Amino acid sequence: MQGPLRQLCGVSLFPSLLRHPSATITHVLSTGALRAHLLAARLAGPVATSRERSLRSYRLFAARDPRVLIGIDPEWSWNERDLIGLMADKCGVSGDPRHTSGHDVIDPERTLVALDAFAERLEAVAQRKGAVLLGTGHPHRLLGFYAAVADALSAAGCTVLTPAHGRCVDITTRFGLRTYNLDYVRGVALVREPDAKSSGCETGAHSHSPLPVRTVLAAAAESGGLLPELVVGDHGWVCGAGQLGFEAIGLADTDDPALFVGEAEGAVSVVVPLDDAVRSDYYRPLTRYVLNRACLSQ
């Protein structure tokens, strides 16, 4: 294990990063090194998401609960057993419905294959210098990943869109109807509570809702400006855009079946299975890997 981890981290072994948050990862030299990182950081392999949590999401999706559909309107009928089979195929979780407890497991090989497909879509839009939209419902963890992608696409000549900046969005939460403000940080859309600090100070609110991306895309259309050729993100940003016919790619955990259903039905282009709630710096090797694969490294 030390060989690939030493390659991954450059000067220090990955366990030192786990002990010291200020440590940095500079390069990813191989898929073997990235596979080791995925397992060491628990981005894949046994992940923090519980089997119970995932099964609950599958049941709610089968019942077409909008909290779990997050913008996807499935064309096919999906029951819980169908979803378990789909997630076993897409993520590598257990396909046995009798397995009802413990940690979910993501196959790192599936993550690597999906990261390559993700990079191919980035490379394609960069080659034609297309307009792109990036948004996240996981800003605390994933803002850095998307911001680096936005920076690289911008440097390649893509227009990074920021429509509806400051627009209010009413989102139903478990606490009732809440109003959020649309904001952009380094080209990445997110929502904030109205009393949150301005850009760059607070990372924004966690949200699964597709309403922000619908608001953003409607504003872009109303203004007569550019529409995105590619939407990059997670949760409702991917599902909401894909359902409206925009090419969308993103990241998803094992308790987010909507993105994988969208991919299976053709509404979403690429979904990368991984734990979407580990420490933000653990995504840096993925960023480097994806940008290298997409020929966007600076």
Where do the protein language model's features map onto the residues?
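Short phosphate-binding/catalytic loops that engage adenosine nucleotides
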Residues: 130, 158-159, 246
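Glycine-rich phosphate-binding loop
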Residues: 217-252
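Gly/Ser/Thr-rich loops at beta-strand to alpha-helix junctions
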Residues: 135-147, 234-240, 255-256
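C-terminal functional extensions of proteins
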Residues: 226, 244-298
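Metallocofactor- and cofactor-centric catalytic cores in central/energy metabolism, strongly enriched
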Residues: 5, 10-137
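Anion (oxyanion) recognition and catalysis
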Residues: 126, 154, 242
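Amphipathic coiled-coil/heptad-repeat helices and related helical stalk/stem segments
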Residues: 115-118, 209, 213, 234
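Long, charge-dense
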Residues: 145-212
